[in-house]
Swiss-Prot record:
The gene coding this protein: gloG
Names of required cofactors: pyridoxal 5'-phosphate
Pathway: Mycotoxin biosynthesis
Name of the top EC class for this enzyme: transferase
Domain of life from the UniProt record: Eukaryota
Family: Belongs to the class-IV pyridoxal-phosphate-dependent aminotransferase family.
This protein's record includes keyword Cell inner membrane: no
Protein name per UniProt: Branched-chain amino acid aminotransferase gloG
Organism (species): Glarea lozoyensis (strain ATCC 20868 / MF5171)
Practical uses of the protein: Pneumocandin B0 is the starting molecule for the first semisynthetic echinocandin antifungal drug, caspofungin acetate. Pneumocandin B0 is a minor fermentation product, and its industrial production was achieved by a combination of extensive mutation and medium optimization. Inactivation of three of gloP/GLP450-1, gloO/GLP450-2, and gloM/GLOXY1 generates 13 different pneumocandin analogs that lack one, two, three, or four hydroxyl groups on 4R,5R-dihydroxy-ornithine and 3S,4S-dihydroxy-homotyrosine of the parent hexapeptide.
BP GO terms, sorted: amino acid biosynthetic process; branched-chain amino acid biosynthetic process
Described purpose of this protein according to its UniProt entry: Branched-chain amino acid aminotransferase; part of the gene cluster that mediates the biosynthesis of pneumocandins, lipohexapeptides of the echinocandin family that prevent fungal cell wall formation by non-competitive inhibition of beta-1,3-glucan synthase. The 10,12-dimethylmyristoyl side chain is synthesized by the reducing polyketide synthase gloL/GLPKS4. The thioesterase gloN/GLHYD exclusively interacts with gloL/GLPKS4 to maintain turnover of the polyketide side chain.
Modified residues (N6-(pyridoxal phosphate)lysine): 195
Length: 358
């Protein structure tokens, strides 16, 4: 910590019961791209959370929009740190190229994120609460047009809000999962592997209906054969095989899923434990072989799965493992990941970036 930076957490906020609803913060960051200049402007901090956008902007009409998800944590010393932000910058650029948005250079992306977080450090929850500051970079085509033409103006913004873990009790007790069978999330050679809103809007109703039926998560199979596991609606899929001398972490190599930074981090930690890691097609028939299953993502971090139901076949797999046991693979992996994110152990992999005063 330096003098007056970062600011301590605000008083009067119930940091232990934040939920995931927006809370008014100090402001956000904006940058603009114009084909006239062919470059992004420098980050500007804006206090008004609302954006003046033309109703005919392609970002509103044609889905020419991308986003990211990141988190900032307060470490034991009171400093604020980001987890692998360079990887978010690279994924943001890949998403931009898919929908004809000028990629935001990595250095500009990181400066914009640093400014957005640095101007809101009083909203970073206290260390040890389990809460964090969620960071939402997003970009969209903003110039008005009704034709399918390349846009001439674009907006890049970074919003932040303090949050609790996404799935609440399921994070500790285990999530119940429903396989979605009447909707394909993504097609081969489509947009499933980038973070565009069009991948998420169509599943909102499915997620809501599943929750009404008592399910915490929804799982998608591949659209070609409906026999392979792709990912959960909002997070990556991780399975654990315990039929050898050491555990084997199994993740999908599908080209229809988002390249998950959390999944990649879990795989790296597993290798550090001298466990095996397999990245390959995952048959749905394998869910009964797994000793443990997790949903992994920025918002959820790592959520243990208690059961998976596929109604069309009557398959209902229940995992009897005690996830809270310190000997479970879940406990070892989730503890190792959280300890790094929250600054409890040395950063041997250079995954952590401290937020500096803007």
């Amino acid at each position: 910590m330096t003098e007056n930076f970062p600011l301590p957490p605000l008083l009067g906020v119930d940091w232990d019961h934040l939920g995931f609803e927006p809370l008014e913060v100090n402001g956000h960051v904006e940058c603009t791209f114009s084909t006239t200049t062919s470059c992004w402007t420098e980050p500007v901090f804006v206090t008004n959370p609302y954006l003046p956008v033309h109703g005919l902007a392609p970002g509103l009409n044609y889905g020419q929009q991308i986003f990211e998800g990141m988190k900032a944590f307060r470490n034991p010393s009171g400093d604020v740190q980001l987890f692998r932000p360079d990887q978010n910058a690279l994924r943001f650029a890949r998403s931009a190229l898919r929908v004809a948005i000028p990629p935001v250079p990595t250095d500009l992306f990181l400066r914009a994120v640093n400014t957005a977080v640095g101007m809101n450090t009083d909203f970073v929850p206290p260390h040890g609460t389990g809460a964090s500051l969620y960071i939402r970079p997003m970009a969209f085509a903003s110039s008005p047009t009704v034709g399918l033409f390349l846009a001439s103006q674009f907006k890049f913004c970074v919003y932040v809000l303090p949050v609790s873990p996404l799935h609440g009790k399921a994070t500790q007790e285990g999530a119940s999962v429903l396989v979605i069978e009447d909707f394909d999330r993504a097609a081969p050679l489509g947009t499933g592997n980038v973070k565009v809103g069009g991948n998420y809007g169509p599943v909102l109703g499915l997620i809501d209906e599943a929750k009404k039926q008592g399910f915490n998560l929804t799982l998608h199979l591949d659209s070609l054969s409906h026999s392979l596991i792709d990912e959960f609606s909002t997070s990556g899929f991780i399975g654990v095989l315990n039929d050898g001398e050491v555990p084997t972490i199994v993740v999908s190599d599908s080209q229809q899923v988002v390249s998950s930074i959390t999944v990649d981090s879990i795989c790296e930690l597993a290798r550090a434990f001298d466990w095996h890691v397999q990245k390959r097609p995952i048959s749905f028939l394998e869910v009964a072989r797994f000793s443990e299953v997790y949903a992994a993502g920025t918002a959820a971090v790592l959520v243990p799965v208690e059961s998976i139901l596929r109604r069309s076949t009557g398959e209902h797999v229940v995992y009897s493992v005690e996830y809270s046991s310190p000997t479970s693979c879940f406990s070892r992996l989730s503890t190792a990941l959280r300890d790094i994110q929250q600054g409890l152990v040395p950063d041997d992999r250079s995954w952590i970036k401290l937020v500096t005063k803007p």
